[in-house]
Amino acid sequence: MNPGLRLACVAVFLFCLAIAIAAQTPPQAAHEYTAAHRAELVQQFSGLLSIPNVAADPANLQRNADLLVAELRKRGIDSRLLSFPGAPSVVFGHIDVPGAQHTIVFYAHYDGQPVTPSEWDGGSPFTAVVREINTEQRIYARSAGDDKAAIFAQLTALDALKTAGIALRANLRFVWEGEEEAGSPHLEQILSANRELVHGDVWLVCDGPVDQSGQQTVVFGARGDAHLEITVYGPHHGLHSGHYGNWAPNPAMMLAQLLADMKDIDGRVLVPHFYDGIEPLSGSEKEALARAPVNDRMLMNAFWLGHVDGAGAHLLELINQPSLNINGLSSGQTGARATNVIPPTATADLDLRLVVGIDWREQQQRVIDYIRSRGYFVVDHEPAQQILQEHPRVAMVLRDEASYNAVRTPMDLPIAREVIEAVKSARKDVVLLPTMGGSVPLGAMERAAQTRTITVPIANYDDNQHAANENLRLQNLWDGVETMAALLDMK
C-alpha cells in the first residue's frame, strides 16, 4: 500500500475511534470499564468490605470513614468529615462544575448491622468470599448489599466517566452516613449544621434492594418507623409451675394474648384508629403500582410460605399501608435451658411501619391506648412493688424516640422525571414505586437539606440484608455502576 494512503487510512481510523469514544453514553462507558477491570474491582470491593462497620466498634467505623475520604481525594474530589459529638462521622465530598444549573446529592451509608460470626458460612462476616450460586456469582460479607455496594458503585462510576472523557454537567455532593443502621439519631443535626454544604435540587438515596423481579427500581418514598417495647409482669421471681400453675398469672401467656388480639386472622390491625389519616395515593402513583410486576407467588415459593396476610391484596398494595410487626419475644427459656417455671416477665419489641399522613408519636399512642383498654396499667419505667400489687395487670411500655415519619416525593415533579429518564437510559425496564417497604430517615434529609428525596437502589432483593450471609450479586454491582454513571451525568 502506498505510504501516503496507509497514513490516511490510519488517520481516518483514529478519527472514527475518537468519534466513537466521544459518542459513548455514560452507561456504555461504565459497562466497558467494569468489563475490563472486573477482577481488580472485586478485589477493591473486598477490601472495603473487610473493615468492620458495626455500631459497637467506633474505631473501625472511623477507619471506614477515613478510607472513604481518601478514596474521594484520590479522585481529586474535595472531601472532609462532618462530625458531631458521640456520633460516627458523615463522609462528605463535593464537585463544583462551572456553569452548572443543578446540584445533585448522592446519599449512602457505610455502617452495617451487628453480626454473629457463628451464623455465617465460614464464620467471618468481614472476609469477603465470592461464591457461584445457580450460575450467578455473589460476594458474601456484611454490607455487601446494604450499603457499601452503593458507595463503591458511585466511586467506580466516577472512574468510568473520567476514563471515557465524559465531563460532569451538574454540581455533585456525596453524603455517606455512619449510623443509618442505628436509626440515624444524629443525621438531622449534622446536616442542619452544614446546610449550605448538603443542600441540593434532589437527594438520590442509594440504599435498599431493587424489585424482586430483578428490574431496576426508582422509589419515591419510604415508610416511617416507630418502635415500642412492651414488658408485662407476673411474680417477682420465677415460680415452680407445678406448685403455682393455674394460680400465679403467667406473663408469657398474658403477653401472647395481648399481642394476638392486635390483629385479625388476615393480619389486619385491630388497634382502634390504626389506619386513620392515611394520605391517598395520587393517580400517577396508582398507575405506577398497576404497572409494577406482581411477584407474590415467586416470593411465596422463595420463602416457603403456605399462606400470606392481606386478605388477597398484593404485597405492593400492602406496603402502602401501615403495619404492626413483632420483632421479637422474650420470656423464660427454651430448648435444653427450659425449666418448669412461671417466668416473672415477658417482653416484646413492636415495629410500627408508617405511611404518609400518620405521625409516629400518634401511632405509638394508639397502641398504648389499646394496651390500656385491655385492662393494663401502663408505666414508662420499671414498676415498684406497690404498683404491681395495686393493679392486676401492669405493662411497662418504652417509646423509641429515634422514630420518624414516612415521606413521599411526587412522581411528576420535573426533577423526578429527569431522574426517571436517566435511570431508563441505563436500565431500560424500570419499576416505579410510590413507597418502599423499608424505612429510611428521608424526612430528616428533606428538612435539614431543604430538598426532595428519590431512592435508587441497586442490591438484589435476596441479599440477606440485616441477616447472616449477606451478599450481593456481582451483576447487580456492574448494573449499579451503569445506573450511577447515568445519574452522575445528569445536568
What is each residue range found by the language model?
Residues 46, 50-54, 73-77, 159, ...:
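Sec-exported extracytoplasmic/periplasmic mature domains
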Residues 54-56, 86, 99, 110-114, ...:
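Solvent-exposed loop/turn segments at secondary-structure junctions
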Residues 44, 54-102, 125-128, 422:
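A non-catalytic alpha/beta surface segment that caps or lines the substrate-entry region
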Residues 166-248:
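Histidine/acidic-residue-rich, glycine-tolerant segments that coordinate divalent metal ions
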